[in-house]
Design a protein with these regions (language model features):
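Strand-loop microenvironment adjacent to phosphate/nucleotide-handling motifs in alpha/beta enzyme folds
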Residues: 47, 51-181
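N-terminal Rossmann-like NAD(P)+-binding domain of SDR-like oxidoreductases, especially those catalyzing
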Residues: 1-63
Length: 181
């Protein structure tokens, strides 16, 4: 709560004080169909950013919602690499679990492009690959162990909520959600 909500509020106060030209909020697919606390706090950060888009006229603002970013700290590949180093089977929560993935290089390019097109609190969601955890694990090793879903974990994350699917504009490489006024 402190980072995702209070941190966003503090950043918005700072952009008002400093008359910043642009504000980009980085979010997660867990905000789309939020149920655990983490997803709800990310969703609130998105809404605060959309609010800023309408009320802070000097600053262009937007949210960028990503899935799992490959080559970042704490991702499944980092965990699997550690397991491989110790000759252990790969930990799989649920073989049929599906997740969206994007490479860190694509993330950087997408953020830079969004700084150009950001305007009034839009949410930009890049198109990402959807894979089952088993499919990914099989590309690395045939030795797996199923550890089960963690509390609050979903079989498949969504990029858009049901309401957002109705209003999202599909572009060649992304979805754009215009904020409600």
């Amino acid at each position: 709560i402190d980072v995702n909500v209070n941190g966003t509020i503090n950043l918005l106060k700072s952009i008002i004080r400093n008359k910043s030209q642009i504000f980009i909020n980085i979010s997660t697919d867990k905000a789309a169909d939020a149920s655990p606390l983490y997803g709800n706090t990310k969703q609130l950060g998105e809404r605060l950013t959309s609010w800023a888009g309408f009320h802070i006229k000097e600053t262009k603002s937007a949210t960028i919602r990503f899935g799992n970013v490959i080559e970042t700290r704490g991702n499944v590949f980092e965990i699997w690499n550690e397991e491989l180093k110790h000759n252990k089977p790969l930990s799989i929560t649920e073989p049929l679990m599906k997740r969206y993935f994007i490479h860190s290089n694509e993330v950087v390019e997408f953020i830079l492009n969004c700084t150009i097109i950001a305007n009034m609190g839009e949410i930009f969601i890049p198109k990402m690959g959807l894979f089952t955890i088993k499919e990914l694990a099989n590309k690395i090793s045939k030795k797996h162990k199923i550890i089960g879903l963690r509390q609050g974990e979903k079989l498949q994350e969504k990029l858009l909520s049901a309401e957002e699917e109705l209003i999202a504009v599909k572009k060649s490489n992304m979805w754009v959600i215009k904020p409600f006024k």
